[in-house]
Amino acid sequence: LSRLILLDIYENMFHNEFPNAMEIMHLTKNQISEMIEMGHSIGTHTHSHISIGSSYLEENELNFEIIQPKTYLETIFKIKSEFMSYPFGQTVDCLSSKELIIKTDSYKLAFTVEEILNKKSTSPYELGRYMPTSLDTSELLYKKMVSMINGK
């Protein structure tokens, strides 16, 4: 249901006001190809940017959200796509390691949006990440890393 609501908002409000939103917000096939040629690994981020863990998706909806983007990347670009980043990162928004493996068995790593220090004991399906912004400097990033290491 949340996916349908989000898609309705997108199609009936956002897309009407910004008809070229897809070109602005998403990478083109050429941009993705260039990134692959430069050596980047390409992962997925779900199809419609919903909270996977709290949406109570049917199996076909879960496949559409998690598996379809992976299949698309692998088919179009002839690559292995084994990583995903949850659109939202609170615990309620993510599948547990066990759930992700049982429901898809398709990924090796999954990233939340929690700013945590990843350790050897961190599940590969619940990795933290830091989302830098255009305002970040190397000094600010260093301070953030020190803060994360110190558990603050």
What residues fall within each predicted segment?
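Histidine-centered catalytic micro-motifs
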Residues: 41-51
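A broad detector of the eukaryotic-type serine/threonine protein kinase catalytic domain
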Residues: 15, 51-52
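Extended, charge-rich helix/loop segments that form flexible
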Residues: 1-38
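C-terminal active-site subregion of NodB/CE4 polysaccharide deacetylases
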Residues: 47, 54-152
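A structural motif corresponding to the C-terminal end of an alpha-helix
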Residues: 30-40, 72-79
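Generic alpha-helix detector with strongest preference for long hydrophobic helices that associate
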Residues: 13-16, 43, 65
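Sequence-level motif detector for i,i+2 pairs with an aromatic at +2
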Residues: 37-42, 122-125
